[in-house]
């Protein structure tokens, strides 16, 4: 005789998360990490941008509750991702803001929510001479924090990217130039000819693969162009790098890098200068985080430089006021 299927339980299920914990201590962040999602963001008059993204989603938790309702986090992420596909959200940092706001609605006990998104973005590029098409992976970071108030939530958001490029060391290049100058003088070459030669053919130096990071934090109503951030990162190193290079391309890339030697410090300062000119419409309290890591070729260590400041602080320093502390 076949066994009758069990009927689903129709009674009220216990809400264990809502019970009181044994230790009544507030928790700063409770949530889920590494939630992998496919993100599609529509753009006006352009193809949609598709990201493979990892989300970290948190809420704060009062000491009176044993646990947070984590399933609500997944529901909110999926709802906002659908809004992005439908065109209601058209920037990835706004996507994080939308998730953070909805989390406050769903977690009525929370006063603070936080959403982080780490993505990889494929950028199509052309090599400088042969114009061969290749692709580059750019790491994209977005974050939003929402805080409950008696009125509307206060939301701060940030958008950033990490780009790989090439740097040429100015120190070693000047050492090599001084040596070459001495040799050429010994061969009877006049200084004017020597200077003309160096202007066309820069001296050799050791190189680094550089990783630049730039992130801008603003209020929720401000717009920060991700493509402009990526462009600033690329232009702040000695030269770009490519997955595929023909011989002519390789010559052009190496020449460009050696004509534009930069220390790791130079890269960070150049980024800061370009941010001030490229995002001059942002308020002075916008926070900029700039990092550069150069993987040395003739040393066993990496070179590193960093700056974190408001736009107002950077502008004051560029204008000659160096009293602001880093």
Curated annotation (Swiss-Prot):
Q: Which cofactor does it need?
A: Fe(2+)
Q: Which reaction does it catalyse?
A: GTP + H2O = 7,8-dihydroneopterin 2',3'-cyclic phosphate + formate + diphosphate + H(+)
Name the family: Belongs to the GTP cyclohydrolase IV family.
Known EC number: 3.5.4.39
A GO molecular function held by the record:
iron ion binding
Q: Which UniProt keywords apply?
A: Hydrolase, Iron, Metal-binding
Q: How does it assemble?
A: Homodimer.
Question: What does the note accompanying the cofactor annotation read?
Answer: Binds 1 Fe(2+) ion per subunit.
An example Gene Ontology biological process: tetrahydromethanopterin biosynthetic process
Q: What does this protein do?
A: Converts GTP to 7,8-dihydro-D-neopterin 2',3'-cyclic phosphate, the first intermediate in the biosynthesis of coenzyme methanopterin.
The protein in question is named GTP cyclohydrolase MptA
Which residues are annotated as site, described as May be catalytically important? 169
Disulfide links within the chain: none
What Pfam families is this protein classified in? GCHY-1
The pathway that the record names for this protein is: Cofactor biosynthesis; 5,6,7,8-tetrahydromethanopterin biosynthesis
């Amino acid at each position: 005789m076949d066994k009758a299927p069990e009927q689903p339980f129709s009674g009220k299920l216990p809400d264990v998360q809502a019970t009181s914990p044994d230790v009544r201590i507030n928790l700063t962040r409770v949530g889920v990490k590494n939630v992998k999602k496919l993100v599609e963001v529509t753009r006006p008059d352009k193809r949609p941008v598709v990201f493979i993204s990892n989300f970290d989603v948190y809420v704060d938790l009062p000491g009176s509750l044993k646990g947070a309702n984590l399933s609500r986090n997944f529901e909110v992420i999926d709802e906002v991702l659908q809004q992005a596909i439908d065109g209601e959200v058209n920037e990835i940092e706004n996507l994080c803001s939308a998730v953070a706001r909805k989390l406050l609605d769903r977690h009525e006990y929370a006063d603070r929510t936080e959403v982080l998104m780490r993505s990889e973005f494929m950028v199509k590029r052309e090599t400088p001479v042969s114009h061969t098409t290749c692709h580059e992976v750019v790491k994209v970071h977005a974050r939003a924090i929402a805080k409950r108030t008696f009125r509307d939530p206060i939301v701060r958001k940030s958008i950033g990217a990490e780009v790989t490029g090439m740097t040429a060391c100015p120190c070693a290049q000047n050492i090599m130039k001084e040596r070459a100058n001495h040799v050429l003088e010994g061969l009877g070459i006049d200084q004017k000819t020597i200077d003309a030669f160096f202007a066309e053919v820069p001296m050799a130096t050791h190189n680094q693969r550089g990783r630049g990071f730039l992130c801008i934090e603003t209020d929720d109503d401000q717009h920060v162009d991700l493509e402009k951030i990526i462009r600033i990162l690329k232009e702040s190193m000695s030269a770009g790098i490519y997955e595929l290079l023909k011989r002519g391309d390789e010559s052009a890339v190496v020449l460009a890098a050696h004509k534009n030697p930069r220390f790791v410090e130079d890269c960070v300062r150049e980024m800061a200068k370009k941010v001030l000119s490229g995002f001059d419409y942002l308020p002075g309290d916008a926070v900029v985080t700039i990092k550069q890591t150069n993987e040395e070729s003739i040393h066993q260590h990496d070179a590193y430089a960093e700056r974190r400041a408001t736009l107002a602080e950077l502008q004051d320093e560029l204008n000659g006021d160096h009293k602001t502390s880093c």
